[in-house]
């Protein structure tokens, strides 16, 4: 005779039993009931909120409707005029530092590049560029610098190079 096949199955791991429709419905109702309970309890604001976080030394619960105990003046008091403090002026930069700031200004560089490319600037942008360039010229004059110095140095270097070439031949 053949050994029964049910015995071989029972020795292995038992299959998980499937839940019936009634059990599934009951679990769904329980989940829905728990979901409805979320949030604060009704009347928690008037009752004082959390009762678990009360201090041990205080027997009477604190009424949340009672506000601040700071005194409020009921009479008309003279207004105290505050003395205006003069705004602290920006520290003056040295002429050299101001010149370096103007020369490395990104907005000025971008606008000058647009001008070199042939674009026209708005009146506001053009006036801003003019003011900054005038300030750069003024600072360079005060510091004794000029644009011509750079050009003359380049010309001097070219002449020296020419002289070296001529001497070498």
UniProtKB/Swiss-Prot annotation:
GO-annotated molecular function: GTPase activator activity
UniProt record, GO biological process: ribosome biogenesis
Keywords: GTPase activation, Ribosome biogenesis
Region (Disordered) location: 1-92, 146-169
Keyword Cell inner membrane: no
Bias type Basic and acidic residues, positions: 20-30, 160-169
Bias (Polar residues) ranges: 49-58
Comp. bias intervals (Acidic residues): 147-159
HAMAP family, per database record: GAP_YihI
Quaternary structure and partners: Interacts with Der.
Function: A GTPase-activating protein (GAP) that modifies Der/EngA GTPase function. May play a role in ribosome biogenesis.
Protein name: Der GTPase-activating protein YihI
Native source species: Escherichia coli O1:K1 / APEC
């Amino acid at each position: 005779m053949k050994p029964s096949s049910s015995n071989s199955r029972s020795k292995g791991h038992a299959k998980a039993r499937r839940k019936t429709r009634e059990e599934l419905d009951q679990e769904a109702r329980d989940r829905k009931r728990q979901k409805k309970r979320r949030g604060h309890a009704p009347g928690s604001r008037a009752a004082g909120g959390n009762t678990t976080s009360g201090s041990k030394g205080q027997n009477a619960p604190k009424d949340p409707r009672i506000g601040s105990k700071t005194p409020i003046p009921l009479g008309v008091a003279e207004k105290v005029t505050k003395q205006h403090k003069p705004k602290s002026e920006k520290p003056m930069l040295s002429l050299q530092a101001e010149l370096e700031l103007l020369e490395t200004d990104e907005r000025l560089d971008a606008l000058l590049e647009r001008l070199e490319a042939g674009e026209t600037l708005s009146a506001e942008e053009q006036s801003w560029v003019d003011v900054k360039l005038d300030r750069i010229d003024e600072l360079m004059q005060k510091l004794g610098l000029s644009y011509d110095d750079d050009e003359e140095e380049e010309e001097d270097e070219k002449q020296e190079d020419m002289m070296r070439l001529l001497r070498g031949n």
